[in-house]
Design a protein with these regions (language model features):
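Structural signal for conserved beta-strand scaffold positions within catalytic alpha/beta enzyme cores
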Residues: 31-33, 291-292
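Positively charged, low-complexity/disordered segments
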Residues: 342-345
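Conserved Walker A/P-loop ATP-binding site and its immediately adjacent core
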Residues: 2-23, 27-29, 36, 62-65, ...
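Glycine-rich, phosphate-binding/catalytic loops in enzymes
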Residues: 22-24, 73-77, 155-163, 206-210
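Inter-lobe coupling linker of SF2 helicases/translocases
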Residues: 42-89, 94-96, 100-103, 107-138, ...
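Motif I (Walker A/P-loop) of helicase-class P-loop NTPases
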Residues: 1, 173, 205
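Short, solvent-exposed loop/turn and secondary-structure capping segments
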Residues: 69, 150-153, 201-203
Length: 345
């Protein structure tokens, strides 16, 4: 490696620098500050990365997003995404898929096309230093789960934990990972996280897209539905409703099969360490369950949460006034201290 770029949470850049120098006292480091990425200073700082001979450059997550890929590469990758979703739409129409799913995919395609049109119409400034010009040949990403909201196309509907929303920072990271794969033969990106899978098994698919896109292409598993049908299945179970009253049937993508094959593929890039293997110092704890009966006021408030949830599900309340996020938040507050309900805390 000639020049390594470490992308870490914003508040940890200095801590990373101190620990890096503790391990490698003679290393030549460049560490970004908040001022370095202000509009007036950003170009100068990127020029220092491009022209300097550094062992490592340490920047924050939000600063990383401000270093653009070249417009040509962005156009090419956006067009690839559009082609991919058009293929999925054509397949759905051939299989007589649900109109709702097709419409959702067409909406996503139009959104991508709008981004592409905006990119094509933008003024090309020759003085902008692009990510490719930095000379970076290794990309290390700490707390990589912060980039888990990557675009996802699927014909599945009403499956909990299957988010098709995307974050711009995740799309940006994905494009840069693809570039790093190109120049290093798929060996230029290293993710570090304690929670690669936290809420949904689809997060494993997302990690594999970041780190094993070439492998997924070879095995025809780049599309989520192909990956899901090969390695997992949806299961429906009865669970407590979030408002705390009653139960509901919920479908989740929560069961794997062909697990040995999946893990063998994932371990081509993953070095997994459990707390037992690392012998981490964890204090012993003694748990005691104390059951406390709810007060009348709490019972009334739980009933109110249920009424609010019913109104949200029926669509008779504006989301800006009330929504399930507010309701579950109030439920958590009520669980610990009823006086917190209705307060910002």
């Amino acid at each position: 490696s000639q020049k390594s770029l470490f992308v870490v949470p914003n508040h940890l850049t200095l801590q990373w620098a101190n620990e890096f120098l503790h391990l490698y006292p003679s290393a030549k480091l460049l560490v970004a500050t908040k001022k370095d990425f202000e509009t007036a200073n950003r170009k100068k700082f990127c020029a220092r990365i491009a022209t300097g001979d550094y062992d490592a450059v340490i920047i924050g997550h939000s600063q990383f997003e401000k270093i653009p890929l070249s417009a040509e590469r962005q156009e090419r990758q956006l067009q690839e995404q559009i082609d991919e979703i058009e293929g999925a739409i054509a397949e759905l129409k051939y299989q007589r898929g649900e109109n709702f799913t097709i419409k959702q995919m067409e909406k996503t395609r139009k959104s991508l096309e709008a981004r592409l049109d905006k990119l094509l119409a933008a003024d090309r400034k020759d003085d902008v230093i692009t990510f490719e010009q930095l000379g970076v040949d290794r990309l290390f990403v700490d707390e990589s789960h912060a980039f888990k909201n990557l675009f996802l196309y699927t014909k599945m509907r009403n499956v909990a934990g299957l988010s098709t929303s995307e974050a711009q920072k995740s799309s940006d990271m994905f494009m840069k990972c693809r570039y790093m794969d190109e120049i290093t033969g798929g060996r230029g990106v290293i993710f570090a996280t304690g929670t690669p899978v936290s809420n949904s098994m689809t997060e494993l698919y997302t990690v594999m897209r970041y780190l094993q896109y070439g492998t997924l292409q070879k095995k025809n598993l780049t599309h989520f539905d192909s990956w899901a049908s090969t390695f997992g299945e949806t299961t429906t179970a009865i669970e407590l409703a979030p408002e705390g009253t009653g139960y509901r049937a919920r479908t989740r993508f929560a069961k794997f099969f062909n697990l040995p094959e999946l893990m063998n593929m994932f371990k081509e890039v993953a070095d997994i360490k459990t707390s037992d293997q690392l012998n981490l110092p964890v204090p012993e704890a003694k748990f005691e369950t104390v059951v406390v009966q709810p007060s009348e006021h709490q019972q009334d408030m739980v009933a109110e949460l249920s009424e609010r949830a019913a109104a949200v599900h029926a669509g008779i309340v504006d989301p800006s006034e009330d929504n399930m996020l507010k309701i579950t938040s109030d439920g958590r507050k009520l669980r610990s201290e009823e006086r917190r309900v209705g307060k910002e805390c």
